[in-house]
Regions:
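Short hydrophobic beta-strand element within catalytic cores of glycosyltransferases
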Residues: 295-298, 305-308
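Short glycine/serine-rich donor-binding loops of glycosyltransferases
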Residues: 283-287, 304
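Active-site donor-binding segments of glycosyltransferases and PAPS-dependent sulfotransferases
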Residues: 26-98
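Acidic donor-binding loop of glycosyltransferase active sites
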Residues: 269-281, 294-295
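Conserved donor-binding/catalytic core segment of Leloir-type glycosyltransferases
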Residues: 196-216, 222-228, 233-234
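Carbohydrate-associated surface elements
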Residues: 168, 187
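Membrane-proximal helix-turn-helix segments that form the acceptor-binding/catalytic region
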Residues: 129-162, 170
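Nucleotide-activated donor-binding/catalytic signature segment of Leloir-type glycosyltransferases, i.e.
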Residues: 243-266
Length: 340
């Protein structure tokens, strides 16, 4: 049986790439495809030396670095991949990978990390954050997203079996595509994030860790700690928002930028609690924190509702608020005080 694995774009190692790594481990002889491949040489270990077959976008100027600017061309690009020689196609999709063309004698399984939120429920937020609420460019962007929604919904019908990474995403698939999906949670290496030796939890700080991008809502956490000057927050992660976050942060917030997993794990083991404000599709990092025995304070929406056990005194906030801080928390070892 010939197997093809199709991923949206290869530019970094995040949750979707961890899933891809496990799919490739299950099918070591599979051929790998992606819209573009721009993973740095020192981060390609998860590909296990595989050649990546890309689309015509790989050859366009600036496409590997500014691949998101070519979103309007990606449906066309993904449809140009010739997969007719394969029996099984597995797409790992949060954008366009599920749109590959397949025939009646081929089986197409698609692991959906999320439908394209920037084209659906987050369109207005994304346009606002990009400064595209008004003007000619705004209308061009809205037209492009409109076309993308039509294509996205149509191509969902070409998938034989949809797989969601959480019940939350299965609900979104049901809403957008009007199809049912099997839930298979992403892999989390909980053994690597086991609790430290007794007495490890000696830190006087709270921790958050993620890419510094708007939807992770690190800004909300920073603003919350601005109102808690006696509590220290450590932020791990790099991204385009990091400079702006540093400029608005109070003295009790420390930014460490990108750190290797060994450093992240050490901070997780020592933190009083892990703080998480994103509405994530699944949310791997809160699971890693809990594997370290660290309490989690989380915004009570998204995949975190399937991985974090709420305290009895949970604040059931329907929206994010610095003043209320509504969320969910789990307090392993009975340390309820760390999640209040």
């Amino acid at each position: 049986m010939k197997v093809a694995v199709v991923h949206d774009w290869l530019t970094q190692i995040a949750g979707a790439e961890r899933v891809l790594e496990q799919i490739l481990a299950i099918y070591p002889e599979a051929t790998l495809f992606a819209v573009v491949d721009a993973v740095a040489p020192d981060q390609r270990g998860f590909l296990a030396g595989r050649e990546v077959h890309t689309t015509f976008l790989q050859k366009l100027p600036f496409a590997r670095r500014h691949y998101r600017h070519f979103l309007g061309l990606m449906p066309l690009a993904i449809e140009q991949l010739d997969l007719s020689a394969f029996d099984l196609i597995i797409s790992s999709s949060h954008a366009v990978a599920k749109g590959v063309l397949t025939g009646p004698d081929q089986l197409h399984l698609s692991y959906i990390h999320s439908p394209m939120r920037y084209a659906w429920d987050l369109q207005h937020q994304c346009l606002r954050e990009s400064g595209l609420e008004r003007g000619v460019l705004s209308w061009l962007a809205r037209w492009q997203l409109h076309r993308l929604r039509i294509w996205d919904q149509r191509t969902a019908n070409g998938v034989d079996h949809l797989i969601a990474n959480s019940g939350f995403i299965a609900g979104r698939i049901r809403k957008i595509y009007r199809r049912e999906a099997t839930v298979i949670y992403p892999p989390v290496d909980v053994d690597a994030f086991a609790p430290g030796a007794p007495g490890t939890r000696s830190g006087d700080f709270y921790l958050t860790a993620s890419r510094a991008v708007p939807h992770k809502r690190i800004d909300l956490i920073v603003d919350a700690f601005a109102q808690l000057p006696t509590r220290r927050l450590v932020v791990i992660g790099d991204g385009p928002e990091l400079k702006r976050l540093r400029q608005r942060a109070p003295a009790n917030v420390e930014f460490l930028g990108y750190q290797p997993v060994t450093v992240l794990r050490d901070y997780m083991r020592r933190a009083r609690a892990f703080v998480f404000a994103a509405e994530e599709d699944f949310g791997i990092v809160p699971v890693e924190a809990q594997a370290c025995g660290t309490p989690v304070i989380a915004f009570g929406k998204g995949g975190v509702r399937e991985t974090v056990i709420p305290l009895e005194a949970e604040l059931a906030a329907a929206s994010r608020s610095v003043a209320v801080g509504g969320g969910r928390g789990v307090a392993p070892r009975g340390d309820a005080g760390a999640a209040t």
